Amino acid sequence: MKNIRLWLTYHDDKQIEEYHLKEDEYIKLFKGNDVTVLGENINYLNRFYSEIVTFYYVWKNNLKTDFVGFCHYRRMLPTICEVDKGECLVYHINKNVSVFNQYKLSHNYQDMCDIIDYLNEKYGVANKYSEYILKGNVLVPCCCFIMQWEDYVNLCEWLFPILFAWDKKNGLNMDPEKYIEKARRDFRYEDVNYQCRTVAFLAERLISCYIVTEMKPFSIITV
């Protein structure tokens, strides 16, 4: 195979042994909460962004390979392969699931409404992205995929301005204390340590949105 790099995110050294994580000619381990890593990063927000900090690091530091992929310590792609331009190998595809309702049942749907408002402001009311979130029934979960580098750059250039606009709208200013304060307000009777990952949950749906509306996803596993 050509130049392929699959970035595997973890956050605790114990996970290396527990999940048998190791690097090889294709896989590169990345500790998402390592704030000493060289290069531009947002690893100090790993608690809230989860593996999205790895996406940012690879993109911002132009760690280019012909094909780039991502997974994390609990989910690995069943295969590693080359893909054509515009194609995307994903972990799996959930069909016949309401993207919006599935989010609404699990998280604070007002955050997703903020995302939809931003998309409508930027791309016009009833644009294909907000329509996907509101009416879509195909979900590509888990943020595990392989695509060509140019496609990945296009994804990041679309994704991160949306996430940072949500941060700004909610007055969070990329501040960990403000992120956890918001989670405690929104989920004061629930699992705050889980729900504080709002931006990661939003990113998961946005990545699915981009892959479904702009690319040709395929998977070894279809649910």
Regions from the PLM with identified roles:
Residues 1-223:
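ER/Golgi luminal nucleotide-sugar-dependent glycosyltransferases, focusing on the catalytic module
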